[in-house]
Amino acid sequence: YFVFYCNNKERVKMEAKRRGLQTIEPKFEMKDILSLNSLKPNVGKKKFLDFDEIENVLIKLKKDGKKIGFCSGCFDILQSGHAVFFSQCKELCDILFVSVGKDSVIRKLKGEGRPINSENNRAYLLGAMSEVDYVILGGNEILPGKIDFYNNLKKIKPDVFILNDNDSAIEEKRRACQEVGAELKLVKRNVPSFLNHTSSSVIIEELNNK
């Protein structure tokens, strides 16, 4: 067997033909974020939620007295800084909800060519992280402060909303927290010295300059 991964189906077929291989297309069809729950590996629980499922999940969590945390972002190219951030988030809560920006919204905020990875790819990678308990897609509306997650925040009403201390819209997000009764917690970007302190945007810029 030879496994060749590529988003371009025709390129895969051409490469297989060149190597004298037969192509087998997966039967799995990605319809929406909920489809990710059927992928392997998983951790025995449903991590990917749509908006209508949030309330039922919260009922049990709050009944069990769990402290709910919330964060949001693009998470385009998952890297060490993200891993450290989620670890910091989990230290402040029992259950962490992550809202990931939709492709259409990220394109509006960051321009053509972004995101590099689709919303389903980004959501799936987030769900694979042990610190992340639930993943939801952000909304279509963009409020001041580049807030595309307000409906999720309002629905979840987390105990804490965790944010990097160098975020460009801290005050706008602080007001959003006040409206839903959440405490805003700022964490410092604290990537260990032996890891590259980088970001998705920096990685993309470096690749484009090569």
Give residue spans per PLM region.
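Nucleotidyltransferase catalytic core that binds NTPs
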Residues: 1-210
